């Protein structure tokens, strides 16, 4: 497996991003290893809040949320998925599979020995994170889902997703910062857009971002469909606290919150919130609001 590593210089002087990098190695399934970057903020002896990003962002997306969570006394773990952020980037599209992404994040949980986790997941962070919850129920204490889903391919994903999937494959240059900009309702500065572009010096670094839309199960016989169906069976028995924090202006995942509230027992009685003035990347549009809701959710649902 050929692996690319973004130079550290690309991450210098990013706006509102003053966090120390941490790294661990995960098996790449081909007799070598990938370096995974993660943030580890707040007291090490506190129960962890795990923040999982999605396509095509990285943990920079959580820069507004982390200070609020740590100020409330929480430890925050925010990894970059392989192919994104400061994590290594396999150079071939075929290096990326749904199962490998799950395995890579499973390795992060295992190596850091995370328990009593509160998960916040958005976009692909949910496709991966909800699998982790279903497969490691004893590690997780609470779940907060925002603008995400866990598709099995048994239901149509909608016109919004199909348009995004087609766009991601046909555009000659995949402009990551522009994609983030188009998924927000607030105006992003050029410096913030550049920060989202920072992990990708050129198109060769973007194979993971290009491949992600094709890995979403969209047919019943998708390679990930069976495992996702199994995950839903487990989630249908999940009685620990589960809250939905979706935004009001995301055409891709709209309605996913109602599905979760219908199926997952742990959603009963929770203060589910539709966050106003938030696009798909609600952490960018309303990060402070999301973080405060997450702090309240943890407070209202002690172990």
Curated annotation (Swiss-Prot):
Annotated TM spans: none
The protein's enzyme class: hydrolase
Keywords annotated in UniProt: Hydrolase
Limits of the AB hydrolase-1 domain: 48-192
Superkingdom to which the source organism belongs: Bacteria
Catalytic activity, EC: 3.8.1.5
Reactions performed catalytically: 1-haloalkane + H2O = a halide anion + a primary alcohol + H(+)
Family listed: Belongs to the haloalkane dehalogenase family. Type 1 subfamily.
Assembly behavior: Monomer.
Name by which UniProt lists this protein: Haloalkane dehalogenase
Taxonomic placement: Bacteria, Pseudomonadati, Pseudomonadota, Gammaproteobacteria, Moraxellales
């Amino acid at each position: 497996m050929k692996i690319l590593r973004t130079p550290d210089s690309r991450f210098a002087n990013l706006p509102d991003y003053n966090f120390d990098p941490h790294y661990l190695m995960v098996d790449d399934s081909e007799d070598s290893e990938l370096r995974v970057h993660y943030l580890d903020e707040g007291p090490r002896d506190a129960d962890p809040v795990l923040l999982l990003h999605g396509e095509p962002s990285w943990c920079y997306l959580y820069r507004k949320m982390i200070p609020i969570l740590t100020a409330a006394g929480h430890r925050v773990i925010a990894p970059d998925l392989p192919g994104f952020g400061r994590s290594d980037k396999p150079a071939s599209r075929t290096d990326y599979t749904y199962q490998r992404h799950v395995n890579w994040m499973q390795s992060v949980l295992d190596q850091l020995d995370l328990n009593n986790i509160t998960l916040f997941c958005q976009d692909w962070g949910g496709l991966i994170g909800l699998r982790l919850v279903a497969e490691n129920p004893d590690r997780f204490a609470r779940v907060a889902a925002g603008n995400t889903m866990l598709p099995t391919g048994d239901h149509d994903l909608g016109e919004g997703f199909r348009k995004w999937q087609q766009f991601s494959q046909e555009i000659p240059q995949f402009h990551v910062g522009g994609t983030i900009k188009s998924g927000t309702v607030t105006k992003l500065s050029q410096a913030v857009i550049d920060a989202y572009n920072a992990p990708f010096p050129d198109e060769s670094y973007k194979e993971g971002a290009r491949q992600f839309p094709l890995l979403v199960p969209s047919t019943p016989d998708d390679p990930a469909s069976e495992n996702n169906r199994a995950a839903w069976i487990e989630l249908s028995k999940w009685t620990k606290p589960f809250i939905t924090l979706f935004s009001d202006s995301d055409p891709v995942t709209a309605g996913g919150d109602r599905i979760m509230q219908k199926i997952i027992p742990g959603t009963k009685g929770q203060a589910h919130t539709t966050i106003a003035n938030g696009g798909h990347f609600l952490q960018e549009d309303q990060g402070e609001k999301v973080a405060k809701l997450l702090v309240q959710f943890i407070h209202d649902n002690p172990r």
